Amino acid sequence: SNELNVKLRSPINEILPHLESMNYKLPAENDQAAGTSPYTRKAPYHYGWDWGPCFVTSGIWQEVELFGWNSWFIKNIFIRQEKCDKDRADLTLEVDIESKNNKSGKIIIFEPKSEIFYEHPIKFSKGENKLYFDLVVVKPELWWPAGHGDQPLYDFQVTIHADGEEEKFSKRTGLRDVTINRVKDEKGESFTIYVNGKPIFAKGANWIPAD
């Protein structure tokens, strides 16, 4: 049988030796834990807030999955939106593959809502590989922030056949255009978020979890 051990280290104690060797410090006004918060990927309120205590914890907070593979597998897929409007969405699909040997096969890309179906022969080599494919969605259903419209999603499904093996990977995403308009004026410079050509007020609240 196999035994899987998970070691959890202190976010503060792990960073402190690095802080001592650096000749500069990053700002951490609310940090009650020796100024380590800018160097860890944790919510700032973990390090103390105006009414919140300093509890810098570590733990497993999502499901754990043990993944096994033989000669190759799909590590991930990414969808980059090059251009998107109500008439057309130009996308680049990146497929990351890791392999123990050089392989050849075919890839099938399918998205049911847009009826995209793409099949093409591929080759990948030993080690990490990145494959890129250009896709077009005609008349896309645009994604909007809450209160401004619907949030339709597209499911991109990738299937690869190589040397008698089959691997599948899917990614769900919304299609939208997001830009930040920065125009100099008499007070400085604007910072307006536009989604699908519409200015959006980015509202929020300065609140940390009560529990």
What does each of the following model-derived ranges do?
Residues 1-211:
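Secreted/periplasmic carbohydrate-active enzymes, especially glycoside hydrolases
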